[in-house]
Amino acid sequence: DFRASEGYGRDWRTAIYRQMGTPELQDYKDGIDYLVANHQADRSRVGIYGGSYGGFMSLMAMFKAPGVFQAGAALRPVTDWRHYNHEYTSNILDTPELGPQVYIDSSPIEHAEHLQGRLLIAHGMIDD
């Protein structure tokens, strides 16, 4: 599990404070390195898939690590934290007024121009 996953203690859970998408992406890249080094994974055939927060991470991976993931699927992802649940987001990123750059750095929409590879985005009206 990447940083911020439940069940590993407070430090692990809060490692993404004011930097959603960055520590987790490093964990994904470390996982790829491990699989290539120890389990004959083919680095040229790595993809990423996820829903909800996993969909957000799929977008961050495709946009902020171009070339690392050849394909991705993001189901019901958050694309801009400024437009998500304030109660949830403000506990992790503060508020857009207090940390506008934090919101920019943590929102996939701000990094979309770096996309390489193939990406499927599927979203309905709500994330349940």
Annotate the PLM regions.
Residues 2-128:
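Active-site-proximal cap/loop segments of hydrolase catalytic domains
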